[in-house]
A protein has these predicted regions:
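Post-Walker A alpha-helix
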Residues: 25-26, 30
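A glycine- and Lys/Arg-enriched "phosphate-lid" helix/loop adjacent to the NTP-binding pocket
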Residues: 59-63, 134, 146-188
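The conserved Walker
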Residues: 18
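NTP-dependent small-molecule kinase module
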Residues: 2-5, 175-244
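Extreme N-terminal, non-catalytic leader segments
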Residues: 1-13, 35-37
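Conserved lysine of the Walker
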Residues: 22
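ATP-dependent NMP and nucleoside kinases share a basic, alpha-helical "lid"
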Residues: 112-162
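Conserved nucleotide-sensing/catalytic segment adjacent to the nucleotide-binding pocket
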Residues: 38, 47-110, 115, 174
Length: 244
């Protein structure tokens, strides 16, 4: 049956500062989707350690978080282009499964409610001759607070490509990570540290500032799924070109 359906690509972007819970949220959403989803982690597109530049302000520290150089941008753009053209993820190495992850669950009732709603959405689209193909991209954005700093300091060891290990030096979050976030998102907010989204971005993004723990993750999951379903019913996504 699916061979007669037009494939429609839906890419869900989840931004968050380092250790803000974006990857965990992405996995909860993936698990609720009836056909699952492919998750793309921007962390997998970081440069090899030997190509990471040193900070101009702190020349003894490598700067993994400057938005201009934090990932291989041409490779990332090429990967997204291929996904839009084929609906398939090009081969690339991922090390997400090797990184330490603190599990924070979504309340079962909320998860099941959205699982049913997403299944309903899928059937609606099938009835219209459309098969939804899901991708989730998680990358570094969101607000900063002391909890993010403590999480980064607790998770100081990062697995790198192709198999190396990076350990955060002292005060790395304050000197490198947070300034990189500010630089990357100054154009998105009216006052990047405490201000709201700029008007042109408020029409395109959903800003989430949930609490800690299961309650906060449940809120983030709930709001995200609501936005996803509403967006799809309003025509979000793009059709994947067919080949003859």
């Amino acid at each position: 049956m699916s061979s007669h359906l037009r494939k429609k690509l839906v890419i869900v972007g989840i931004g968050g500062a380092s250790c803000s819970g974006k990857t965990l949220l992405a996995k909860h959403i993936r698990n609720a989707l009836p056909a699952g989803a492919t998750i793309i982690h921007q962390d997998d597109l970081c440069h090899p350690e030997e190509k990471v530049p040193y900070s101009s302000r702190y020349p003894d520290l490598q700067d993994w978080d400057d938005p201009d150089t934090c990932i291989e941008w041409p490779k990332f753009r090429s990967l997204l282009h291929e996904i839009r053209q084929s609906g398939n993820l090009p081969s690339h190495a991922s090390h997400d499964h090797l990184n330490k992850e603190v599990k924070v669950e979504v309340k079962a009732g909320v998860f099941e409610r959205w699982k049913v709603e997403l299944e309903k959405l899928s059937k609606e689209q099938t009835g219209q001759g459309v098969e939804l193909v899901w991708f989730i991209v998680d990358g570094f954005v969101l607000y900063y607070d002391d909890v993010l700093r403590s999480r980064r300091e607790e998770r100081q060891v990062y697995v790198l490509q192709p198999g190396g290990v990076w350990v955060d030096p002292p005060q790395y979050f304050d000197k490198i990570v947070w300034p990189g976030y500010l630089k990357a998102h100054d154009h998105v907010f009216d006052g990047v540290e405490t201000g709201p989204l700029k008007e042109e971005w408020s029409r395109r993004l959903i800003l989430l500032t949930p609490d800690e723990g299961e309650e906060g993750m449940t809120t983030a999951f709930d709001k995200s799924c609501e936005a996803i379903v509403e967006g799809c019913r309003n025509g979000a996504g793009s059709f994947i070109p067919t080949t003859s």
